[in-house]
């Protein structure tokens, strides 16, 4: 089998490529260049897809004895990931750029080019498993990345391989060391790779500009002003510009964001509890959408808690009734549906959260 190994320069993708070589496949390593401008991606131990990472990936490919190339996806990454991220925040949403990158870059643009060049499979270092075409959680639940892969279609999964999903992270590092790979102890990447400073608010402010508005309480009383809704997210407590706590002496939290009027609503922490979710642009990883209500568990953050629920597709929208409340759910987040399974929870599908309702009348209008 002809395999394209997506090599980020980290330990996970390096071991994934090595395992595909061990399996006897014809393997070619590719590193995705996501920026041509210096300083626009995190470097070294704090990011991925930088020039240093490309060099690390090349050295691993040399050890493995496989061809290695760098493919330029900078413009598409800027358009489909960075610009989408900025636009989403301008709408008062809270997106996950890693989900978007997997959907539009790694398993759309990269996979499409690979298939066009005659490759059968794209292998990555994601912690997830495929069984009979079904996407499942990784053995290492602490590192499980099935959440950020739940946006993939059945067609995309047919050309995917996750060689390390059945192995705990600590064993992956040990294996890399045994293989003599210099990246064995390379730290994991964290945060958002295209925000070198780590200051998301400043990054967004430079691109969106000042759009002044107000912060109000549940009664509509103006408590503060702000320079843009992009500086807020649902559940935020600090940096609100408010002098003190609420009338009950408890801290205030962002409970809703109205980008049209540039109004940020704050309230009690209990106002953040939601029990129904609405999702747009649903994707079902097994291919066919469910024909009726389906029992599942729902996850709305990459490593967040799961809650039992019933989900149903009505028209183009996914409606989810939670059996227990989730706290601090924002529009733009990805909701992922799982089917509980002792062999590894199976991903049923995903959607982008378009709305949510809370336990009280009026709920959480900004979620």
Curated annotation (Swiss-Prot):
Site residues by UniProt (Interaction with tRNA): 126, 333
Compartments reported by the entry: Cytoplasm
CDD domains xrefs: MnmA_TRMU-like
EC number of the protein: 2.8.1.13
GO CC annotation: cytoplasm
Protein source organism: Mycobacterium tuberculosis (strain ATCC 25177 / H37Ra)
HAMAP family reported in the protein's UniProt record: tRNA_thiouridyl_MnmA
Job of this protein: Catalyzes the 2-thiolation of uridine at the wobble position (U34) of tRNA, leading to the formation of s(2)U34.
Annotated protein name in UniProt: tRNA-specific 2-thiouridylase MnmA
Family recorded in the similarity comment: Belongs to the MnmA/TRMU family.
Pfam families: tRNA_Me_trans, tRNA_Me_trans_C, tRNA_Me_trans_M
Record's catalysed reaction(s): S-sulfanyl-L-cysteinyl-[protein] + uridine(34) in tRNA + AH2 + ATP = 2-thiouridine(34) in tRNA + L-cysteinyl-[protein] + A + AMP + diphosphate + H(+)
InterPro entries, sorted: MnmA-like, MnmA-like_C, MnmA-like_central, MnmA-like_central_sf, Rossmann-like_a/b/a_fold
Active site: 101, 193
NCBIfam families named in the record: PRK00143.1 (NF001138), trmU (TIGR00420)
An example Gene Ontology molecular-function term: tRNA-uridine 2-sulfurtransferase activity
Keyword RNA-binding in record: yes
GO biological process, one term: tRNA wobble position uridine thiolation
Chain residues that bind ATP: 6-13, 32, 125
Disulfide bonds: 101-193
Superkingdom of this protein's organism: Bacteria
Keyword entries, A-Z: ATP-binding, Cytoplasm, Disulfide bond, Nucleotide-binding, RNA-binding, Transferase, tRNA processing, tRNA-binding
Annotated gene: mnmA
């Amino acid at each position: 089998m002809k395999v394209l190994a997506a090599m980020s320069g980290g330990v996970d993708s390096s071991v994934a490529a090595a395992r595909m070589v061990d399996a006897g496949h014809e393997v070619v390593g590719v590193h995705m260049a996501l920026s041509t401008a210096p300083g626009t991606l995190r470097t070294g131990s704090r990011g991925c897809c930088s020039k240093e990472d490309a060099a690390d990936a090349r050295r691993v490919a040399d050890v493995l004895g496989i061809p290695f190339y760098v493919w330029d996806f900078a413009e598409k990454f800027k358009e489909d990931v960075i610009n989408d991220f900025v636009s989403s925040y301008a709408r008062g949403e809270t997106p996950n750029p890693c989900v978007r990158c997997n959907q539009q870059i790694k398993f759309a643009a990269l996979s499409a080019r690979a298939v066009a060049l005659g490759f059968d499979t794209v292998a990555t270092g994601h912690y997830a498993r495929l069984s009979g075409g079904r996407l499942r959680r990784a053995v290492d639940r602490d590192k499980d990345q099935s959440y950020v892969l739940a946006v993939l279609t059945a067609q995309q999964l047919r050309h995917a391989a996750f060689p390390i999903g059945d192995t705990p992270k600590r064993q992956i590092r040990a294996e890399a060391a045994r293989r003599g790979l210099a990246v064995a102890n390379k730290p994991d990447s964290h945060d958002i790779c295209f925000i070198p400073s780590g200051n998301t608010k400043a990054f967004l402010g430079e691109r969106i500009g000042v759009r002044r508005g107000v912060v109000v309480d549940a009664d509509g009383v103006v408590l503060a002003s702000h320079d843009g809704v992009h500086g807020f997210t649902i559940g935020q407590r600090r940096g609100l510009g408010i002098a003190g706590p609420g009338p009950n002496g408890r801290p205030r939290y962002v409970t809703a964001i109205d980008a049209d009027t540039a109004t940020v609503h704050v309230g009690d922490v209990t106002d953040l509890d939601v029990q129904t979710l609405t999702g747009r642009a649903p994707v079902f990883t097994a291919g066919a959408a469910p024909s009726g209500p389906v029992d599942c568990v729902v996850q709305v953050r990459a490593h967040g808690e799961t809650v039992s629920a019933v989900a149903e597709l009505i028209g183009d929208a996914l409606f989810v009734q939670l059996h227990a409340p989730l706290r601090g759910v924002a529009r733009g987040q990805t909701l992922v549906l799982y089917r509980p399974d002792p062999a590894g929870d199976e991903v049923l599908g995903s959607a982008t959260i378009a709305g949510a309702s809370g336990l009280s009348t009026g709920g959480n209008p900004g979620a």
